[in-house]
Amino acid sequence: MKQSKMLIPTLREMPSDAQVISHALMVRAGYVRQVSAGIYAYLPLAHRTIEKFKTIMRQEFDKIGAVEMLAPALLTADLWRESGRYETYGEDLYKLKNRDKSDFILGPTHEETFTTLVRDAVKSYKQLPLNLYQIQSKYRDEKRPRNGLLRTREFIMKDGYSFHQSYDDLDVTYDAYRQAYEAIFTRAGLDFKGIIGDGGAMGGKDSQEFMAITPDRTNLDRWLVLDKSIPSLADIPEEVLEEIKAELASWLVSGEDTIAYSSESSYAANLEMATSEYKSSSKVTALDDLVEIETPNCKTIDEVAAFLDVAEHQVIKTLLFMVDHEPVLALLVGNDQINAVKLKNHLGADFLEPASEEEARAILGAGFGSLGPVHLTDGIRIVADRKVQDLANAVAGANKDGYHLTGVNPNRDFQAEYADIREVKEGETSPDRHGVLQFARGIEIGHIFKLGTRYSDSMAANILDENGRAVPIVMGCYGIGVSRILSAVIEQHARLFVSKTPKGDYRYAWGINFPKELAPFDVHLITVNVKDQEAQDLTERVEASLMAKGYDVLTDDRNERVGSKFSDSDLIGLPIRVTIGKKAAEGIVEIKIKATGDSIEVHADSLIETLDILTKDN
């Protein structure tokens, strides 16, 4: 493919509106362009990468018997009313009317559509299991699109749905998908973890997320590719290294999720779902009487603890939430933070949001900073974290502005239901007791769910079992964020290319090292002087030999300065660069392996053989 015939609009500078490196590079390298807020055009390079990823997916899904199809993106609202999600999905749902004023939506996901199709076609257990998937654009009305392809209003997704007679059968397919996802992301060259996840608006009982790990910005060895003029990192002057560190630190750490994982075992979970080992620390002690004490201007845990000269963990943190329009108190020890997802899941709620101060005054008679669980009116549900039950003679708000109670004791002074509703902390013991929890940022690239009968119950998707009884179909759901993969790959494979000029000056510039299976082309063939006929003839011969051996070749035939060509090549990020320069008359070409920065000159007749040797382990 001739580069002069492709739309690859590279930029000399990073785009000013980009905050994460993947967004900046995919724009600067000419992979995507924003059409409007949260809506992107995938230019030829991005399209080729996405198509290669689709091929990997199809190959792995063929192995587990998944069958591809295509459902409409424009959906009738009646389907979503039938499942109950039309009202509960929230403001992210694109709603529209046709000329007859009938309600439609643009599909953010397709559980209802697939459930209906199977419900209408499948009547007997003998027709199951079914394993269907599609790859298409989805739509969500994001309030604040950001970070390139990570948070958009239109995005490409692979969503699959499986249909079963039993949960045992679902378990088999669920595990097959888990293994397929691991194979797909491994082939795509991603560093990822499969973690315990939250089902969210999808419903269901079990789920696993697949997270691409955001690289550590402090590890220079994994970010820098050194030119052959620089033997090692130790040869770079300290002031240059400090500049490079500052450049790395100037980009936001990508990834909307924090992952908690064990330092010694396979345990890993989204922070929203993560737990740590819990050991009861309750002690037998004499219980003090309740005493109301004035605590002027003390509204935070640390202010109250300092005023009363107690440890922060002895102060009960009281938070008021409105849960499905009813008040719920959540209690924590003072130095812990609430995990709203855990609380919502414990309550089985559709909606959960912090109460306003006005609501707190109307319900409890006091403002924030003075709320507590003692002497409440009947009907207010209290959920306390497990650690609260270990407290004795604690401090809590008195539900009276500027006052707190001392001598507060769970079970004597208030009744609560206990659950794990706290956010874990780095360094705590893993729940499997192997290692301690460590944190990392990650980009969600896949999610699998055991939906169970969530949709078949609400949409009457039943089959007849062996005994002729009508039973609901058991479902699974399996998603991959296809367009997100491009961001995740670039985030992990962005590099700073460092070189040294003949005068001894150090230069560094951003580029991409695409993994072989996802690179839009295998080889970037660059002719330094396109006006040199011998160089042109050699270019055509090399191009033909590469293509004959199955290499996808992007030939830079533009009449541009060689510096611009090399700069664009680093940005675009193909695994191999072959340069035809001053030694074209001798038949000599230069091979450069982008991942390592290594280069070698060989005769054109030995090019294929040399490439086979250089790339056999890559």
Curated annotation (Swiss-Prot):
Keywords recorded for this protein, A-Z: Aminoacyl-tRNA synthetase, ATP-binding, Cytoplasm, Ligase, Nucleotide-binding, Protein biosynthesis
Pfam families from the UniProt entry: HGTP_anticodon (PF03129), tRNA-synt_2b (PF00587), tRNA_edit (PF04073)
Gene3D superfamilies for this protein: Anticodon-binding domain (3.40.50.800), Bira Bifunctional Protein, Domain 2 (3.30.930.10), YbaK/aminoacyl-tRNA synthetase-associated domain (3.90.960.10)
Biological processes, Gene Ontology terms: prolyl-tRNA aminoacylation
Main location as per UniProt: cytoplasm
Enzyme Commission number, as recorded: 6.1.1.15
Catalytically driven reaction(s): tRNA(Pro) + L-proline + ATP = L-prolyl-tRNA(Pro) + AMP + diphosphate
InterPro entries: aa-tRNA-synt_IIb, aa-tRNA-synth_II, aa-tRNA-synth_II/BPL/LPL, Anticodon-bd, Anticodon-bd_dom_sf, Pro-tRNA-ligase_IIa, Pro-tRNA-synth_IIa_bac-type, Pro-tRNA-Synthase_IIa_type1
Protein name: Proline--tRNA ligase
Originating gene: proS
